[in-house]
Amino acid sequence: MTMQLLHISIIALSFIFASTLQAERLLHLRLGEREWDTFPTQSESDSLDHTFNVDEDNMPRSFSFEQIDVKQQWTLAINSKTIGKLPRDENRMVVFFDIPEGVLKSGNNKLTLVQTGRKTPDDIYFGYLRFYNVSTQEHLSQREISIQVTDQATKQGTPCRLTILNSRGTLAGTGNESTNTTAVREGVIYTSTGKVTLKVAPGKYTIYAGRGMEWSLDSVKVDVTTASATTAPPHYPLAIRREVDTAGMVACDTHVHTLTYSRHGDASLPERLITVAGEGIELPIATDHNLHINYAPLVNQLGLNRYYTPVIGNEVTTRVGHFNIFPVPDGAPLPNHTLETWKEIAASIQDQTGASAIILNHPRDVHGGITPFSPARHNDVTGRSQLGWEFPATAME
């Protein structure tokens, strides 16, 4: 079953806005069985098939929509030409895509959204479709907002996370791109200095500043609907403070990956290091797969060494389990990740690195066809291996 949306026309409302979908709501789509019982018993459709009409003299160049709870691969196409895939993210967010030249035609056009790839059940919400007659970057760079976040105790700028919500409480897009002091995603900007000039489309926003669980939040409501693009950006100072006394303790993330080295996720190494500071982590462990990566040189180069101490580790990724190990001496040889038993793997880890911490990761997940804590390999009642193996780790994740 395919959901046929209401017909719309492209109407030039201004240089920037081109059209809005008449159905101002979110549609519930599902392929397969209901994912969780928190979703309605019946979805509205398993896919989206939307016809819209455009004028040859006013062709849209980009469009946006809102999505919620996307976990699997959903592909957007216009006139059977793939535009892109929905970000796999459960948050409610506004997503933008540019429309490549030659995709649209004068008259009727068709936008489709279908789940592709592995057909795993996935309930999602999609809607508030809008078209624009400028590029995404142009649309999201019409206005600027100056933000400075300081530590209330020191009165100095502080690393933090900025969350930008639109008037519906949805993560809003910005025209910002990641720099050597910022890491940018939909509705979120991490800053290592506390200082950011936001680029946004005209509208009403709520901007939150925080720095992980130990710090307070501050926020400001901003209306840039009618502000002139030629005037100086309005400036909003925000201040946060440490609220949890953690004397004698350290905030540690023992499982840190980067796209740069692990080839999954989407954070480059510089982006990841900025987010570590922005979340108040004080002891991050580098655990890229079967690699010993020293983050310290780039941490120092980015001026982040006053906020945390990076530790070399490794997610030793084997057929019979994934093990985060640390600390690892700089230059230490890699453990043998091709070994087939926990005893051999533990011995290789000790021989090559001497790591004192070994964490067995996600033992109930399937990787390479093997689940370390499946009933065939692990007795839940006794806590012992069905294979007679000794537990090799000092902790589990």
What residue ranges belong to the model's regions?
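Aromatic sugar-binding surface patches on proteins
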Residues: 91-97, 182-194
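Surface-exposed loop/turn motifs at beta-strand-loop junctions within extracellular Ig-like
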Residues: 115-117, 151-153, 211-213
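Short, ordered, surface-exposed loop/turn motifs in non-cytosolic proteins
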Residues: 153-181
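Extended, charged catalytic domains and RNA/DNA-binding interfaces, predominantly
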Residues: 158-165, 169, 187-397
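Bacterial N-terminal signal peptides that target proteins for export
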Residues: 1-9
